[in-house]
């Protein structure tokens, strides 16, 4: 007699344990694993109950399951940005999360048949207690409720609201949503592509759910059936077509065209060739000195512009300029002009170029190289402490400078011709050299200039490739190798 009274009060189970009374409450305060275990163990120990009591137990379990899903959904909504996925892209994920929540709230992902929706299950549960419930709904509930356990990852990673949390995991649209969210390329798709993907997936699942209707619809509307097949076939290709075309990452046509033009391999190779040719054409020579760079640019921009324009096509076609082979006559004349004047004006350079049948650029480069060599010799003399007037004398004893053999022989011939035939400042230069040699090398001799006898021979011997030999007396002979630069 106590069981009907307990059933009228809404309590379930017997008076044996207080934990069974807690199971009758719709929303328990501490919802934990221990409470679930405590609720399930006495239910298994109780004897089989009538169908009405079983319906009430199922309603209570359904309410508990809905409350548990609501708690999981609220905790999942708190993690809108996924901290362990890509922390530097949280803004883009937040935008995708807002779009997906709008789509889910609008009902795009919900199924058309209200089989798993809680709002559709509650009226059925309220209408069932009057007649004895048939067994198929119980089997449907048993099929729906237990598979909630293998889907904790979906509820954790999918941002959905508690209204959509009641969807059963066995629903096809729910599984499709989980698959879409777990795929990597869903973040690179636009909203339009997602809607197309959703529509195609919904049509495919409807065809799978109703194969008879799909067979009836296949022969009659070929165009209407081709559109979902076309969209479904193109849906895997959507990421490749839609990457970079999202509204958040649009780029202007000019910038995209510039990037595509500059980064294409053909144009990249062309730019590299241009830069290399420009580097070779801008540099006049490989051994040009740095202090002559500004002057060479100024001179090249002056009257040398015509020759540079004339040789522009040939210099662009060739990667490197070949060395000019000067004749002996040209070298003699160039050496003579260099001894007379270290720097040339534009008019002098043009005159020398026309007389020697050379271009002004060749004359300019030869003078630059010659000045660089002259400065190296001067620096070597000053480091030895032997140069008094290095600009005019250029004296040295032994300075190992790599000089071409032909140029050295031509220079020695030029010195011989200059001493024997030419007139001008060179005899005075020879007198200066002899006087400076006598005064500058007194520390190497055993006596002073006064100690040399008045009748002592002071001879000037000219060697072929050696230079000038000076003998100071018979007792203190000293031979010096000199080359006039």
Curated annotation (Swiss-Prot):
One of its GO terms (molecular function) is RNA polymerase II transcription regulatory region sequence-specific DNA binding. GO terms for cellular component: nucleus. It comes from the Eukaryota. Residues 54-64, 284-293 have a biased composition (Acidic residues). Disruption phenotype: Embryos display segmentally repeated ganglionic branches that stall and fail to penetrate the CNS and the segment-specific cerebral branch and associated cerebral anastomosis fail to form. The keyword Transcription applies. It is found in: Nucleus. Residues 114-128, 308-317 have a biased composition (Low complexity). Expressed in the neuroectodermal and mesectodermal cells at the ventral midline of stage 8 embryos, Subsequently, expression domains in the CNS widen and have their most anterior border in the posterior deutocerebrum. Oc/otd and unpg are mutual repressors at the interface of their brain-specific expression domains. Expression fades during germ band retraction and is then restricted to subset of cells by stage 14. Expressed in the founder cells of the cerebral branch within the first tracheal metamere. Disulfide bonds: none annotated. Pfam families: Homeodomain (PF00046). Its main location: nucleus. The keyword Transferase does not apply. Residues 319-378 bind DNA. Residues 1-65, 114-157, 212-325 are annotated as: Disordered. Residues 223-234, 254-267 have a biased composition (Polar residues). One of its GO terms (biological process) is regulation of DNA-templated transcription. Keywords: DNA-binding, Homeobox, Nucleus, Transcription, Transcription regulation. Plays a regulatory role in neural branching of the tracheae: segment-specific aspects of these neural branching patterns appear to be generated by homeotic regulation of expression. May have a role with oc/otd in the postembryonic development of the brain. This is Homeobox protein unplugged. It comes from Drosophila melanogaster. The lineage of its organism: Eukaryota, Metazoa, Ecdysozoa, Arthropoda, Hexapoda.
